[in-house]
Regions:
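Conserved serine DD-peptidase/penicillin-binding transpeptidase domain
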Residues: 1-183
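C-terminal soluble interaction/assembly domains
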Residues: 170-173, 183-202
Length: 202
């Protein structure tokens, strides 16, 4: 996923396909629903010649046209990340406000909050580190793992604009503090759990 401070459903769209009559196009449901992305449905119901069920996006062009294809012989579910997660969040947020009858300007912008005479923080939401760690350890969750890496970097540097490398530097410093040699470990990113381990039991 494209990590940003504004994430809606982890920047991912879940597409569920339901079969119809044999040879017909399957019915699709997308969560979260939004006009930020478009949907192309070329699925076929109970038609093995259509190939395996697949959900994809025109990622080479940084587009958000989701294409769902292949054979649907039963309920099928797939996920795809959306380009520019912050814009996905804002676009869908304003769309939901308008659906509730709340008037909004067609344009939007976002930046760091600067408290002044015309700006007031209306709400603040925080997730505990323990809750994030629990999620990371439960299943391979790259988004939360990358977010945790960035959080480590922010705590390590004290800065507001941080990168994955800042988080890796914090981990290397901890390894050294524990009496080990950081260069002996392959620290690549904040990726979630893996079927193979780069780090030894020490």
């Amino acid at each position: 996923p494209y990590l940003s401070p504004l994430m809606l459903d982890k920047g991912v769209v879940t597409v569920t396909a339901f079969p119809g009559m044999q040879g017909d196009t399957a019915r699709l449901e997308c969560t979260p629903a939004s006009s930020y992305y478009t949907l192309t449905n070329t699925t076929k119901t109970r038609a093995p010649s259509a190939g395996r069920f697949r959900v994809s996006r025109d990622w080479l062009e940084n587009g958000n046209d989701i294409t769902v294809s292949g054979n649907v012989d039963g309920k099928r579910t797939g996920t795809v990340n959306i380009y520019s997660s912050q814009d996905f969040f804002m676009h869908t947020f304003l769309e939901r406000l308008r659906a509730k009858g709340i008037r909004c300007l067609p344009d939007y912008s976002f930046s760091e909050f600067q408290k002044d005479s015309v700006s007031v923080r209306m709400a603040s939401y925080n997730t505990s580190v323990q809750a994030v760690v629990n999620q990371i350890m439960k299943e391979s969750d790259n988004l939360n793992a990358e977010a945790m890496l960035c959080r480590l970097g922010a705590q390590f540097t004290g800065g507001r604009h941080i990168s994955a490398e800042d988080g890796l530097s914090a981990i290397r410093r901890l390894i050294k503090k524990l009496g080990y040699v950081p260069d002996r470990y392959n620290l690549a990113d904040g990726c979630g759990l893996s079927n193979y381990n780069y780090v030894s039991s020490e």
